[in-house]
C-alpha cells in the first residue's frame, strides 16, 4: 500500500464518524469531574495526558501492538490469549461493557465492509467477547496499516474522545478543546514510543496499575446525573 493510501485508511479508521459509539463513553472522566478532580481546561488536559502516559502507554498500547502482530501472523491463539487478558483487566462493569460494545461494533463493520481476507474476518467474527483493541488491531491489518501508525491513530482517537467528553461535561469551549488536543500530540507520540519498548521485552512489560480509574468507574455506575456510559 502506498503511503498516501495508508494515510487515507488511517483517517477513515480514526474518524469520529466511525460507527462504533466512542462518543458515548468517558472512561471515568465524567466521574472525575463530578468529584472535582477535573474542573477546568488545565485539569482536564492533565487528566487526559496522565491517562495516556501512565495507563494507555503501560498496558493497552503495548497490548495493541501484540494483537496487531498476532493478526499479522494469523496467530489466532495469541490473539485470543491477549484478548482474554485485556478483558480480564477491565475492573468494572462499565469498562467491560465499553470495550465489548465498541469491539463488537467494529468487528461487525469489518465484516460488512469486507475488509481483509476471509480468514481474518472469520476469526474476528467468532471471538466473543471481542475487545476494542483486538478489533482495531485486526482492522489495521486488514487495511494494511503498519503497527506504529495504527497505534498512533488508536491513541489519538482515544485522546480525541476524551477531549470531546471534557468539552461536554466540564464544560469547555470548542477552541479550548482544540488547543488541548493540539498540546496532546506529543503525549500520543510518547505513548507510542513507550508501548514499542514495553512490547519488545520478554515477557512484554504490561502494567494495569490504575486504582483511581477503577474507583471512579465504580462510582460512575451510581452517579446521579451523567451524560456518558462510563
Swiss-Prot record:
Any one cellular-component term (Gene Ontology): cytoplasm
GO MF, any single term: nickel cation binding
InterPro entries: UreF (IPR002639), UreF_sf (IPR038277)
Keyword annotations: Chaperone, Cytoplasm, Nickel insertion
Domain of life: Bacteria
Location in the cell: Cytoplasm
Gene3D superfamilies xrefs: Urease accessory protein UreF (1.10.4190.10)
The family this protein is said to belong to: Belongs to the UreF family.
Quaternary structure, from the entry: UreD, UreF and UreG form a complex that acts as a GTP-hydrolysis-dependent molecular chaperone, activating the urease apoprotein by helping to assemble the nickel containing metallocenter of UreC. The UreE protein probably delivers the nickel.
PANTHER family the UniProt entry points to: UREASE ACCESSORY PROTEIN F
Stated role: Required for maturation of urease via the functional incorporation of the urease nickel metallocenter.
HAMAP family, sorted: UreF (MF_01385)
The protein's name: Urease accessory protein UreF
Lineage: Bacteria, Pseudomonadati, Pseudomonadota, Betaproteobacteria, Burkholderiales
